[in-house]
Structures are given as structure tokens and as C-alpha cells.
């Protein structure tokens, strides 16, 4: 979060690379990581509230755990849904698509992403807008798998 330009994009990219390493180098089960992300979500609700308590900006750029959580959702669910070996180039293509889509939804904030961003000036709003952006990515991937 201390990177001056586009810290959210850097956090999302770092998350994407980190998850690729966990899933495809260390071969960690995606269910374990998804469960960990859920735990991190609840811990972050508390931790982010403490961090932003005295700040006027309730969604500071220094807080990037929300990008980690939001970017992790589609990647973990992709890995759970595709539990068969795939070629690395195909996996990297989908990871890249998930990264780009997440950034688009996180930046443009279509409803309900914008709803959480505007109406909850607390840790719940900080994190839930990214969770919704991640769920939009999941929805697009599901539609892709159904129709293509």
C-alpha cells in the first residue's frame, strides 16, 4: 500500500502471482486457501476499522488487504472448479483475464460495488466493494464456461 502510484493494481498483481505460486508451485489445495481468505476477511474487518478510525479518508490507498481478498475470490474458485491439470500457458491466460477483469470492476465500480463504496464508510465498505468486484469476475467466468 505504500507504492505511490496504483497501489491497488500492484496489490492485485502481487496477489495473482502469489496465488499462482501457492497453487502451481507448492500445490496447495485451493479449498485451504479459500478458507484462509475467509478468515482474513473477518480479521480484516476488525484490523481495517482500527487503522481507519481516526482518518478522514475511510478508504485510504495504504489499505490493500481488500484487493487481496477481492482478487483471491475468483482465482480460488477458478482453481476449485478446474481441479484437473492444465497447461501453464492456459492457466496464466485465465489468471491474467481475472486480474484485468477485477481491476476493471474495482476501478469502475458498477452496482453493487459502488453501493458498498459510497454507503459504508467503514471497514465493511472498504472490503465489500472488492468482494463484489471479485464476484463479478466469478460471474463472467461462469458465463464463459457455460456458453463457450
Model-derived features with residue positions:
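Short hydrophobic interaction/assembly module
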Residues: 28-55
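Alpha-helical transmembrane segments of multi-pass membrane proteins
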Residues: 20, 37-46, 70, 79, ...
Amino acid at each position: 500500500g505504500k507504492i505511490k502510484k496504483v497501489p491497488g493494481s500492484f496489490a492485485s498483481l502481487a496477489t495473482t502471482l502469489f496465488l499462482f505460486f501457492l497453487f502451481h508451485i507448492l500445490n496447495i489445495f485451493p479449498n485451504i486457501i479459500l478458507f484462509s481468505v475467509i478468515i482474513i476477511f473477518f480479521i480484516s474487518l476488525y484490523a481495517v476499522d482500527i487503522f481507519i478510525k481516526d482518518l478522514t479518508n475511510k478508504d485510504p490507498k495504504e489499505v490493500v488487504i481488500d484487493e487481496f481478498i477481492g482478487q483471491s475470490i475468483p482465482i480460488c474458485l477458478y482453481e476449485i472448479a478446474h481441479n484437473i491439470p492444465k497447461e501453464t500457458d492456459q492457466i496464466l491466460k485465465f489468471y491474467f483475464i481475472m486480474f484485468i477483469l477485477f481491476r476493471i470492476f474495482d476501478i469502475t465500480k458498477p452496482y453493487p460495488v459502488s453501493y458498498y463504496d459510497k454507503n459504508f464508510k467503514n471497514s465493511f465498505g472498504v472490503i465489500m466493494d472488492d468482494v463484489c468486484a471479485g464476484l463479478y469476475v466469478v460471474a463472467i467466468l461462469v458465463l464463459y464456461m457455460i456458453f463457450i
